[in-house]
Amino acid sequence: AFSKAIELMERVGIPQPEIRAKQLPYELSGGMCQRAMIASALVSKPKLLIADEPTTALDVTVQAQILQLLSELSSELGLSVLLITHDMGVVAEIADDVSVMYGGRIVERGSVENIFALPHHPYTQMLLQTLPRVDRPRKEELFTISGSVPSPGDQRRGCRFFPRCDRAVDDCKERPVLLPGVDGAACFSPL
């Protein structure tokens, strides 16, 4: 088991894996801890790797290395990666297909290209508008989405984004909205 751990630690780019394997987490950098977590996830040779916020609290250089590692592992091992993140830059960098969630529900699904170029759900559009962009004037204020996120206990029947949406209609408040097929938006008034 130890030799397999060393092999996987080496594969994910941890230097001196024989030494690092005996260290405690606080003795490792954030990037090494993330690599160790990825190595431990690969022990059982999964077909799917669920990566929940894999780049949070990492500097930009280490973040790029972790994304590159996930991409390489996906190709080499035939591994699907389910990436859970709030970082739309990470989504743009690594994802093929995207599911946008709001309040615990999927509100839009599509290819990364379609989601970024032509969002159909008002939340997706507003989410993308909040991203800082280099082509905007420096003094321009960042876009914010008005209102509050629903509490986890709020189990409204309709769209959870309804109170914050400028395109909402009566049906949005009362009726559950289903995603149409594989791609599309769960919205009565899509863009």
Region spans (language model):
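Conserved ABC ATPase signature
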Residues: 23-28, 32
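ABC nucleotide-binding domain "signature" region
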Residues: 1-12, 127-130
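Short catalytic/signature loops enriched in Gly
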Residues: 15-19, 109-191
